[in-house]
Design a protein with these regions (language model features):
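Glycan-recognition and catalytic cores of secretory/periplasmic carbohydrate-active enzymes
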Residues: 5, 21-24, 33-347
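N-terminal secretory signal peptides and thylakoid transit peptides that target proteins
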Residues: 1-17
């Protein structure tokens, strides 16, 4: 076990933040989010992803503190920004609007965002995050303004949810009945995965761009998640967690960091997947056959819970996961799975 493991080390080792720059500090601050700026006053839209338990002395550079010079990285940044400007938000919003009875004459998206696909809506969350990150990196006003328009449109959809028969705060591109199916075990793709992507994108819009409406929307979503999951027994919730749920524990821990409300840590802990966490807590390798990339956001969430002051067990789970994967499930090219599934131990 690596006693110095922190969130930045863990993320880099699992390949999810290899490009993030870190800087040593002499203060007592914890590791901050891989996507954010240095923390300032809460509510200003900057990264306040601080933890109470890490004791680490590293944090990432604020994105705006680094300017890329001409070269391949700058070229890629320009391409990325151009793509973000190109994406038609009304096409992505089509299924959100029609889901709650709002008019839309936009052409629906295809692929995994098609109107008949159960994962629809997740790309909108990715776009929210991408716009926020790109604006924080470049200062480009068009990216900031596009993110604000998208947040405002999602807020309108959320406000229309009760009239459509959905719970207050519900926001998605598919009906709430998907969660009825999830809880009943009758088969559905991955509804909490999509909810996580939307919530994470809204958090980034608030934290990196300062869009206050984004925090309002994501807190209403979080209240909906709380009310929905509070009704389930422990056994029922564990069955729910057998279906991919992204990093729900991670984003809820972020809400605690932003608001100071311990309620969000309580809700985050409901997304502790015992079948995965319990063996790791005992340093047992039960990863073979699991959907590999599904486990990484769970572990990031475990670290965030520990950073925000919850049990040391969460750090132990994440440390053991990191050590087991890097020592026994990693190929020479850096991959940790075959066909997205963890394989038997490689060493």
């Amino acid at each position: 076990m690596n006693p110095s493991l922190g969130r930045r080390h863990f993320l880099a080792a699992t390949g999810t933040a290899a490009a993030a720059a870190t800087v040593a500090t002499g203060g007592a601050g914890a590791a901050h989010a891989a996507t954010g700026a240095a923390p300032t006053t809460a509510g200003t839209g900057t990264d306040t992803d601080t933890g109470t338990g890490t004791g680490t002395g590293t944090r990432p550079f604020p994105l705006g503190a680094v300017t890329l010079l001409d070269g391949p990285f700058r070229d890629n940044q320009r391409r990325n920004s151009a793509y973000l400007r190109f994406v038609d938000i009304d096409r992505l919003l089509h299924t959100f609007r029609t889901n709650v009875g709002l008019p839309s004459d936009a052409e629906p998206c295809g692929g995994w965002e098609g109107p008949g696909v159960e994962l629809r809506g997740h790309s909108t969350g990715h776009l929210l995050s991408g716009l926020a990150l790109a604006h924080a990196s470049t200062g480009e006003e068009a990216l900031r303004d596009k993110g604000r328009r998208l947040v405002a449109a999602l807020a309108e959809c959320q406000s229309a949810a009760p009239a459509a028969g959905f719970g207050t705060g519900y926001l998605s591109a598919f009906p709430e009945s998907f969660f009825d199916r999830l809880e009943a075990g009758s088969g559905v793709w991955a509804p909490y995965y999509t909810i996580h992507k939307i919530m994470a994108g809204l958090v980034e819009q608030y934290r990196l761009v300062g869009v206050g409406q984004a925090l309002e929307v994501v807190l209403r979503q979080a209240r909906w998640v709380d009310e929905r999951t509070a009704k389930l027994s422990y056994e029922q919730m564990q069955r729910v967690l057998e279906t991919e749920f992204g990093g729900m524990n991670d984003v809820l821990a972020d809400l605690h960091a932003l608001t100071g409300d311990p309620r969000w840590l309580d809700v985050a802990e409901r997304f502790t997947h015992a079948r995965v966490f319990d063996p790791l807590a005992g340093n047992q390798d039960k990863l073979a056959g699991l959907h590999a990339n599904t486990q990484i956001p769970k572990m990031v969430g475990a670290l965030r819970l520990w950073e925000e002051g919850r049990a040391d067990r969460y750090r132990t789970v994440a440390e053991n996961f990191w050590q087991i994967v890097t020592d026994h499930h990693t190929y020479v090219i850096g991959a940790t799975a075959t066909a997205r599934r963890s394989t038997n131990r490689t060493s």
